[in-house]
Amino acid sequence: MANPNNNNDNKQNNNNNFFNDNPLLAFAIFSIVIILIFKSFVGEGESLGTMMNTQGVAQTKQVKYSEIKKRIEEGAVKSVKLTPSMVEAIIEDNGRKVRYVAQNVPTYDRDLIPLLDKKKISYEGVVGNGFFSELISMMLPILIFFAIWIFLAKKMSKGMGGGILGAGKADKLINSEKPDTRFDDVQGVEEAKDEVKEIVDFLKFPERYIELGAKIPKGVLLVGPPGTGKTLLAKAVAGEASVPFFSVSGSGFIEMFVGVGASRVRDLFAQAKKEAPSIIFIDEIDAIGKSRASGGQMGGNDEREQTLNQLLAEMDGFGTDTPVIVLAATNRPETLDAALLRAGRFDRQVLVDKPDFEGRLAILKVHSKDVKLAPNVDLEIVAKQTAGLAGADLANIINEAALLAGRQNKKQIEQSDLLEAIERSFVGLEKKNRKINETEKKIVAYHESGHALMSELSEGATRVTKVSIIPRGLGALGYTLHLPEDEERFLKQKHELMAEVDVLLGGRAAEDVFIGEISTGAGNDLDRATAILKDMVSVYGMTDVAGLMVLSRSQNSFLGAGAVSTDYSDKTAEAMDSYIKSTLNERYGYVKETLQNYYGAIDNMAKELLGTEVIEGKTVRRIIEEYEQEKGMPSRLAHKDKVAKNKAEADKKEEALKKEISEESDNNKEA
């Protein structure tokens, strides 16, 4: 049985569609209403303004025409002005002039003029609004609003795909030609490429799958952190399949007009079907695909929700024989609506994650093809020192190194340029103009020396790459740089977390031991150390405070830490605070004792920093080794074996490079 409410809704939707589909008619109706309003206010004022120009009038009265004729017959009228639709009479009343105005007078009153002549009253005719004046008064508001309309249409045409009059139309095909990107251009995401290769095969040979009755996924969702190559991978799929590529951002569906998003989705899918086989790519789909259960929206009429509903309907409308694939990208998959991820829509999710060592090396090779590298450049070292960076970051490092080399008028990019670019990526730009006084420079030198010493002596810490007291970034007056040079690490053990805490406390402890007074420079270190210990208690179950209970739950997000929810009692919170405080005090005491045992090493390191402002990691290790030998102490360097191994590998590579250059030189001589 039909639902009458549905009929009413359909009627309302039809009415809305009528005005959306007939914008010119809507504009005409709107213009007529404006003209009527304009005439009612302006027309009368113009007529009155034309006549009311007599000076010395004390009062104006709106009266009937018969009242004016009566006054004329009484001889009280001094002068009269006439128009086809109005009569104005000036009357002397107790020594003051009063204007009587009568509107809508009879058109043919043949008695008025003879009466005025008989009473010897002066009169004159006033030219009213003629045909052209009336025409202008009617057309002026139309012209004004039409000019505004055209102005807005031109302003919004780029973003609206046809302007206001075509608000529902999708922008034209972004890539009018098929993309020339190939899978070889996308490196570091081999698993993701394998997942989407069957899509290419389906687009090239759809009949092969249709005959077998196979159902290819209608939608593939590419998820991963920013800068990992999701858009590039989507273009590569279209390029490999040689099909049209329709690309649009999720935010591009939402405009100021209600219903535009849904209409644009319909038009986009219609274009894709005409060009089939084809690919639709929706970047940042979370802009329109957020969960409807998350709240914060204004009911069923919300523009984003209408757009999402239309997208779901269009994806349901695909048949199994329609060779159109929808690719979408997001770095916030946890916010997407469940209906969008169900089977038959975006039922396949492909992780496009940050690359590992091999992936970073491949990406660096791709981006370094078009730049001139010096023979001594070792991209493997760069790949090892850029763990955790995405493909976009690596491309930026190559470009930044090229810019640095260009500023120094170099002919080739050297290894030092690449290392400086990496440093910029991790700790920011050098602040050469920020001058710090000698006292603060001394504090920073000992602070960073404390970090460096604990990094080298703590088992599980990352060894030092460089120590600097040159200000960088937003607020750092100095820094100790730790760049990984070993294998990829995905887990951290308890002793490694405690080593991080020791390294963070090393700066404050050095100030305490060598300066005799602490500064505000350790604020961020203490914050990070506290956060590590808190996670050990509430997330990792590494202490006896809560045992194996998880007290804090965070929502996974590729954009960093998501929302954290806590669910524990005040008593547990008190126990957690007590553990963190006691552990910090315990580790701080251990770090201070270690620094006192290596007093001379810290002192020498700080003096070296004050003299040169920057020292390399190998210099830090040399100073520590010399002090240990001087005092007859057993070596506590945690990375001694790794350093020896890396040095041997570096010497071997250098020897091979020299041999290669020598052989090339001999060949040139023979030629």
Swiss-Prot record:
Membrane-related topology note: Multi-pass membrane protein
GO biological process, one term: protein catabolic process
PANTHER family: AFG3 LIKE MATRIX AAA PEPTIDASE SUBUNIT 2, ISOFORM A (PTHR43655:SF2), ATP-DEPENDENT PROTEASE (PTHR43655)
Binding site for ATP: 224-231
One cellular component term from this protein's GO annotations in UniProt: plasma membrane
Gene3D superfamilies reported for this sequence: 1.10.8.60, 3.30.720.210, P-loop containing nucleotide triphosphate hydrolases (3.40.50.300), Peptidase M41 (1.20.58.760)
Binding site for Zn(2+): 447, 451, 525
Name recorded for this polypeptide: ATP-dependent zinc metalloprotease FtsH
Family label: In the central section; belongs to the AAA ATPase family. In the C-terminal section; belongs to the peptidase M41 family.
UniProt cross-references to Pfam families, sorted A to Z: AAA, AAA_lid_3, FtsH_ext, Peptidase_M41
Main location, first listed in the record: membrane
UniProt cofactor(s): Zn(2+)
Organism: Sulfurovum sp. (strain NBC37-1)
